[in-house]
């Protein structure tokens, strides 16, 4: 005798998270952005493991298709900060590094090292090598003697000893890292790649952000403004916080809840030829002063100036300070 599946005679209770998927996906006319409060509640459920895997995938891809709003990003960030058990540490710059480089070497790492030598306390964080063909910060920490920290205590020690610490996202927000790792399952990057740049988990004096795709920079700036953070958002080379000397740079800033904009003209009269290969030893040689190369010198000095601009120095002063820091750096690695 055949056993047939039981009939559903009573309507199942709706999952509490279903409302948020419905808000985002209810057709062209019915769908809308989440409010800041809804975003905070939704991300809170995700972080508390109260969401089914199918719901999470749908939620992330609907957000990606719609394009997240400043209010959503602010709400998501508030949910994470409310659950983040981070100590109180004195940090000048929050420096997210999630994109990886493919056209040029990561000169921003030398910029960060040079700033740290001069008393600027920098917290860097990243999400690992998620896309093939790119060079990620995590792969170069040992080469450049940048401390890899796996606990907040190690971060505090590294900041006190040398002013620079790198901590992987997986060690302080593992649920977010898991969502980033869905990239090769879902076929697209999720909004978490963008969210990670806004988080500023230690409440640094300024958060630096690089957003490559046009139109997103202002959204990120507005989200940081809603959170009361000081931040500068740029379209950095390859999506990393690194000024491209071959192009104009637009700075999207927010300070004290007020937005500001600044245009920085390109530094090089001619475009540089992209290197045929990314040779890590070239990074070390430039730091040690063994080779003269105009592109990295322009890029890293301008990137230092960007950071100093975020800490309150006007543009001309920031460039002068950056050039002095670079000229007087300790060239040992």
Label each region the model flagged.
Residues 1-104, 116-118, 122, 269, ...:
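Acidic, glycine/proline-rich low-complexity segments that act as flexible tails and inter-domain linkers
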Residues 59, 141, 196, 304:
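Residue-level signal for inorganic ion chemistry
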Residues 90-157:
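A generic, well-ordered mixed alpha/beta core segment in the N-terminal half of proteins
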Residues 92-94, 120-123, 139, 147, ...:
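Structural motif
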Residues 127-129, 171, 236-238:
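Short, ordered loop/turn segments at secondary-structure junctions
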Residues 150-210:
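Phosphate/diphosphate-binding glycine-rich loops and adjacent basic-rich segments that engage nucleotide
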Residues 186-288, 293-297:
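A structural signal for small-residue-enriched, beta-sheet-centric alpha/beta enzyme cores
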Residues 300-311:
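Short, small-residue alpha-helix embedded
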């Amino acid at each position: 005798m055949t056993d047939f599946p039981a009939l559903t005679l009573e309507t199942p209770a709706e999952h509490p998270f279903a409302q948020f998927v419905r808000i985002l996906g209810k057709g062209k006319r019915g769908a809308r952005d989440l409010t800041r409060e809804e975003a905070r509640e939704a991300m809170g459920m995700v972080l508390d493991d109260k969401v089914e895997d199918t719901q999470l995938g749908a939620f992330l891809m609907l957000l990606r298709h719609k394009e997240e709003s400043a209010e959503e990003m602010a709400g998501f960030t508030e949910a994470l900060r409310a659950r983040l058990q981070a100590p109180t540490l004195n940090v000048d710059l929050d420096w997210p590094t999630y994109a990886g480089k493919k056209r040029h070497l990561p000169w921003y790492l030398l910029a960060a090292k040079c700033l740290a030598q001069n008393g600027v306390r920098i917290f860097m964080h990243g999400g690992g090598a998620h896309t093939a063909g790119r060079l990620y910060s995590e792969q170069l920490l040992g080469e450049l003697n940048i401390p890899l920290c796996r606990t907040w205590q190690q971060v505090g020690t590294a900041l006190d000893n040398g002013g620079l610490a790198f901590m992987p996202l997986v060690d302080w927000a593992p649920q977010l890292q898991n969502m980033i790792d869905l990239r090769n399952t879902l076929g697209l990057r999720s909004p978490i790649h963008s969210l990670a740049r806004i988080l500023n988990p230690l409440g640094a004096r300024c958060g630096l952000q690089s957003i490559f795709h046009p139109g997103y920079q202002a959204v990120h700036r507005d989200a940081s403004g809603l959170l009361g953070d000081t931040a500068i958002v740029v379209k950095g080379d390859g999506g990393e916080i690194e000024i491209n000397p071959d192009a104009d740079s637009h700075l999207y800033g927010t300070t004290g809840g007020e937005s500001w904009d600044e245009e920085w003209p390109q530094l090089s009269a001619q475009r540089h030829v992209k290197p045929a290969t990314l040779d890590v030893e070239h990074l070390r040689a430039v730091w040690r002063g063994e080779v003269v190369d105009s592109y990295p010198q322009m890029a890293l000095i301008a990137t230092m100036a960007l950071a100093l601009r975020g800490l309150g120095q006007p543009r001309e002063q920031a460039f002068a300070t950056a050039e002095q820091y670079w000229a007087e750096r300790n060239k040992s690695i």
